[in-house]
């Protein structure tokens, strides 16, 4: 499922100017796919469900490279941060385990209630980049 979602994002999507070097956004319905292409790994993150009606918030994640192995446990190198700076660890990774050069899956977090004005996902130590940040405004 996540593979199809990420593939659909690129089909007919219009790029939005990047706010920082190596980061870009692509509109996908209500949410934007954020892309970080620093170093040797391209990382994309797209919110899937971020509303008060769900018990879990899900983010589709894509990791693509041709030069390094993707050995990270994404539940250990990722964190969700709300607009007040509260940090939430993922409760699950739905996708292939560590290894390989192309990984797609879904990071799952417990829903934040009440919903914050903004959230960001930070993913650390992928492809030699200490930290990659992906942010969205919710309200």
Locate the predicted segments by residue:
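Mid-length scaffold segments of soluble, non-membrane domains
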Residues: 44-92, 103
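Short, solvent-exposed, Trp/other aromatic-anchored flexible loops in extracytoplasmic proteins
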Residues: 84-137
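Short linear motifs in intrinsically disordered
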Residues: 21-25, 66-72, 110-114
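Membrane engagement elements in two modes
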Residues: 1-44
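Short beta-strand/loop motifs in extracellular/secreted proteins, especially
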Residues: 41, 76-78, 117-119
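Generic structural motif
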Residues: 48-50, 64-66, 112-114, 126, ...
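Short coil/turn motifs at beta-sheet boundaries
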Residues: 36-38, 52-54, 71, 100, ...
């Amino acid at each position: 499922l996540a593979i199809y979602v990420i593939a659909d994002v690129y089909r007919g999507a219009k790029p939005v100017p990047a706010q920082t070097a190596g980061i870009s956004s692509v509109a996908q319905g209500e949410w934007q796919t954020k892309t970080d292409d620093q170093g040797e790994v391209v990382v994309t993150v797209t919110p899937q469900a971020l509303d008060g009606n769900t018990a879990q918030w899900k983010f589709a994640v894509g990791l693509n490279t041709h030069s390094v192995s993707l050995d990270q446990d994404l539940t250990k190198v990722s964190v969700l941060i709300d607009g007040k700076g509260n940090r939430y660890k993922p409760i699950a990774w739905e996708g292939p385990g560590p290894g390989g050069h192309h990984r797609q899956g879904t990071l799952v977090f417990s829903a934040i209630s009440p919903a914050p004005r903004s959230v960001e996902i930070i993913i650390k130590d992928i492809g030699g980049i200490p930290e990659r940040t992906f942010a969205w405004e919710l309200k």
